[in-house]
Regions:
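Conserved short submotifs of the Hanks-type protein kinase catalytic core
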Residues: 81-97, 101
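AlphaC helix of the eukaryotic protein kinase fold
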Residues: 40-62
Length: 315
């Protein structure tokens, strides 16, 4: 087994992306399991990937929230053969991703809504810090026995910052990109809210709100056709369906904020979520109720309470 800087013993590779690997590891100093993300060995040492993984560490380290996988450390190891490798040490979230659960079909609407409430709460914490995730999707949502963990702020960026990629290239997953992202507009929290709408739609139906066979066809359909309306789902509160529709609005100004979405979705399943103390006053187009308004006003250190139905447990 390899050890990074004499401290982090890499035990098992648990994920591989286009520019990085994630390993289950062991912190030999603090005597605990951790996750380590590092640039994939064998990739050429270009500044872009290195800068992005450093940015991920800095962005995620600013977030202290129960639905965000916390960052413990960042470094550059000289012990990897061939070249120095930057790495991030993160909380090891035990469970399965939402993508894995959705392979079996749609979730019960109560579970889907609760999952998305916790995702929205994580986004609200990020947005309160001026951070846009930019890659909200089922593969980046981990379902653990204790609740949801939003993973991989690897392409996160400060709200309003231009995309660092070359002209004509956009980072993100095509099905979850907001219309303005396709036009290379600066990242804003509203882009994350579009992705949340797709995530909610997919969790409720196990399909995307667009019909396409390939990624290129998907991008073409995205530009020519609006998202398909959410089908009728027995028992689903109408305000949840309306929220999903609002999140998928072409106009970013018509989408609800992450704070409003988190509170509305939590109310729909009688759950509670951690939300930022600072309450945005703009772009509150989603319907709210007295409970939601009261919760927002009183949310100083909200307690996360697990209500039935429980999240799917790790298999």
């Amino acid at each position: 087994m390899r050890t990074l800087d004499g401290r982090y013993r890499l035990e098992q590779r648990i994920g591989v992306g286009g520019m990085s690997e994630v390993w289950r590891a062991y912190d030999q100093v603090l005597d605990r399991p951790v996750a380590v993300k590092l640039i994939s060995p064998g990739r050429d040492d270009r500044d872009g990937p290195v800068d992005r993984i450093r940015a991920e560490a800095r962005s995620a380290a600013r977030l202290e929230h129960p639905n965000v996988a916390s960052v413990h450390d960042f470094g550059t190891s000289s012990t990897w053969p061939g070249r120095p490798v930057p790495y991030i040490v993160m909380e090891l979230a035990e469970g399965e991703t939402l993508a894995v659960h959705l392979r079996a079909g749609p979730l019960d609407w109560r579970i889907a809504v609760r999952v998305c409430a916790e995702v929205a709460a994580a986004l609200a914490a990020a947005h309160a810090e001026g951070i846009v995730h930019r890659d909200v999707k089922p593969a980046n949502v981990m379902l653990t026995p204790a609740g949801v963990k939003v993973l991989d702020f690897g392409i996160a960026i400060a709200a309003g910052e231009p995309d660092p990629m070359p002209t004509g290239m956009v980072l993100g997953t095509p099905a979850y990109l907001a219309p303005e992202q396709l036009d290379e507009a600066p990242a804003t929290p509203a882009a994350d809210m579009y992705a949340l709408g797709v995530l909610l739609y997919y969790s409720l139906t196990a399909r995307l709100p667009y019909r396409a066979a390939t990624a290129s066809e998907l991008l073409l359909v995205r530009r020519r056709q609006p998202p398909e309306p959410l089908p009728d789902i027995a028992g689903l509160p109408p305000e949840v369906a309306e929220l999903c529709h609002s999140c998928l609005a072409d106009d970013p100004e018509q989408r609800p904020t992450s704070l409003v979405a988190a509170l509305l979705l939590a109310e729909a399943v009688d759950a509670r979520v951690y939300v930022p103390m600072t309450i945005p006053t703009s772009r509150r187009s989603a319907p709210t109720s007295p409970w939601t308004e009261r919760a927002a006003a009183e949310a100083t250190e909200a307690v996360a309470v697990a209500h039935e139905p429980n999240l799917p447990s790790a298999r």
